[in-house]
Amino acid sequence: MTLLTACGGGESNVESGNRDGFLHYGNGAEPQGLDPHVVTGVPENHIVRALFEGLAVKNPITLEPEPGVAERWDISDDGTVYTFYINPEAKWSNGEPMTASDYVWSWNRALHPDTGSLYAYMLYPIVNSEAYSKREITDFDQVGVKALDDLTLQVTLNAPTPYFLQLMDHYSSFAVHPETLLKHGKMTDRFTPWTRVGNIVSNGAFTLDEWSLNRRIIIKKSEHYWDRDAVALNGVYFYPTENVVSEERMFRAEQLHYTQVVPLDKIPEYRKQGNTSYVQAAYLGTYYYLVNTDKAPVDDVLVRRALSYALDRDTLTRTVLQETAIPAYSITPPDTLGYNPPKLFDYDPAKARELLAEAGYPNGEGWPGLEIIYNTQEAHRKIAVAVQQMWKKELNIDVSISNQEWKVYLNSVSQRDFQVARRGWIGDYVDANNFLDLFLTDGGNNNTGYANDEFDDIILNLAPKAKSRDERYSLFYKAETMMTVSYTHLRAHVTAMYLV
């Protein structure tokens, strides 16, 4: 990251931050919360990962797992038993030592059906975790998580899981402080005051110092973090700014060191600048539209196919997105750790019109209407307008678009109160499984209504037991093919752009 230095009269945030060791960060929306077992969004992720740390952490360059709370680990010869040895210096922010029992309690909470964690399925590689999460068993002692002593945690898996250590760096696997949660409610309660300033006890490099709603969140370096001397920053200011233009203006005024959003019409200007602060880089993520398969008219696969064939992704990425993205024809990004997903369709407006007519809407006649929802941001609006215009031009159908504030949007998606909804998925770990398991039947992040027993069996049982990477990827390809032809989501692009 490049830190900017201020110029002109008065001291900017960048100038004071450079002097005092505080990063000023544009964080998009106001976070829904800071509970690792409840939140799901990118704005929440940035803060939660600063406040908490997992058993392992990813090296930012190699992406390989490195020691976090666990100073080391052993893996059995058959790859199914992980033994984590907790660092004796790992402490909670109140100074209490971390223990293996903290993880047993926390994973009980994350998997408990009453908690309603949308990421519970992340822990399904663990023996009996899925059965516990689905109330098929009620005794957590039957789940493959055991505290052998205060500093030794043993985890038993259903099958060798290549990405399991990467999961230890995802907030769904983070430990929470049991006594703090129970002081403010039951183990499974959601959005209680335990995450507020003065209440929260965390274990990461930073602690929560201030949370001024819709203004800023301040975190400061923790006095009790085990690797405190390696933390370069004294703190971070997170600013919730859903207005992209305002956030970019803050960046230019040197009120921010870093922003991940850039007004699309400003990108050519930044590209022309010498020594520019604009960075465009590969991102393991896919931008797509969710389709609620229980809502007419998109409950008809013919309609969903027509909408997909009528979407000109090349034009969208070239003109609207200023070539900051590549067209996406699958949920999994191309070449994800060597896995290349199927491409089963392309832009074909004639085929789209044929499919729509077959569905009973020739040339758009009798079309009942359709709404796209998206969370408030200018780029999302421009994409929605472009898609709206493409569908009108090619299919002669009317589509309305509606923006929603971040928390309202998250609720609409989780309650499946939409026909078509903007969505993006950033890889939590580097593996195609992280994109495909989004569509498991009744999965916490499956908001489409897609349900396929064969798909579930491949993702949950067959792929984990594959004898080779080629066999595993072949199974992924089969699963992604059957899921793609259901057209439960309309892939748009893969992208990354930000200012530093």
Could you say what each language-model-derived stretch is?
Residues 213, 357-427, 469, 496:
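Ligand/substrate-recognition segments at binding pockets and active sites
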Residues 209-220, 237-295, 318:
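Extracellular/periplasmic solute-recognition and catalytic clefts
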Residues 318, 397-409, 414, 434-491, ...:
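Extracytoplasmic/peripheral linker and loop segments enriched in polar/acidic and small residues
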Residues 26-77, 199-202:
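N-terminal lobe/hinge region of extracytoplasmic solute-binding protein
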Residues 104, 111, 118-183:
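Surface-exposed binding/hinge segments that line
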Residues 60, 160-230, 235, 245, ...:
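Gly/Pro-rich hinge or "lid" segments in bacterial periplasmic/extracellular proteins
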Residues 220-221, 299-389, 393, 449-454, ...:
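Append "and occasionally in soluble cytosolic enzymes with long acidic Gly/Pro-rich linkers
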Residues 71-122, 154, 297:
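Aromatic- and charge-enriched surface segment that lines or borders ligand/interaction sites
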